[in-house]
Amino acid sequence: MDDYFNNYWTMKKLRDGAGEIVQKKFVKFYPLNDPARPSEAHKLWLNYVMSANNVMDFGAGDLRFREFVLRNGFKGRYRALDIGKDFKYDFADLDETREKFDLILCFEVIEHMELPKFVGLLDKFRKKLTDGGKLIITTPNIHHINHFWKGDVTHVRPYPYEDLYALLRGHGFKSAVMYRIVWWESESPVFYAKFSLRRILTHILGVDYATNIGFVASA
């Protein structure tokens, strides 16, 4: 936290430039209940995995994404890390391994962390990545209206995309691209009509219709 304020103006300059890296086209997402029917978001992340040799899934959860990756022919090393006890993971803490990774995945984890802990984790991620390695982070979009009306008691800190971009760049990542992720309920005409109306209303209200955001940062 002190590091952020000690470099406040540098971080502010980075934050002010965040809009340049936002991808205008949104990416559809829905749960990976059937590995044969992945969403656009899962296909996007899979492309990054297939280009790597050594992957760390930080906060691997129910391991569905790992199963999806392996079913699609990934031949590299895929390490799963989580503090949970419901599934078998390779690690419970990043300090348990001295390996370097081409890709670190961190899906829907950082909103469970206060800022000082997350900043410390970013530094660890940077040290664990190979030169040119990539970090993928997804988190709820604070600019989405659900942030105001719905919540999760385990979420302790929202991360606006502007600040997340500044933190990534300020902690040694050379570049970052942001994707806007939309929870896609179905392909029915009714949902398309609802979604079109939602886009109009959120524009009027000055909020975003993208439910989540995803960053791909390069070390």
Protein language model regions, located:
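Conserved N-terminal segment of class I S-adenosyl-L-methionine
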Residues: 1-99, 103, 116-123, 128, ...
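Short, contiguous strand/loop micro-motifs
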Residues: 32, 112, 150-152
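A short beta-strand submotif of the Rossmann-like class I SAM-dependent methyltransferase core
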Residues: 103-109
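Hydrophobic adenine-recognition pocket in adenosine-nucleotide-binding enzymes
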Residues: 109-112, 141
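Short glycine-dipeptide loop
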Residues: 129-135
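Short, glycine-/aromatic-enriched active-site segment of Class I SAM-dependent methyltransferases
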Residues: 137-156
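Short alpha-helix
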Residues: 156-172
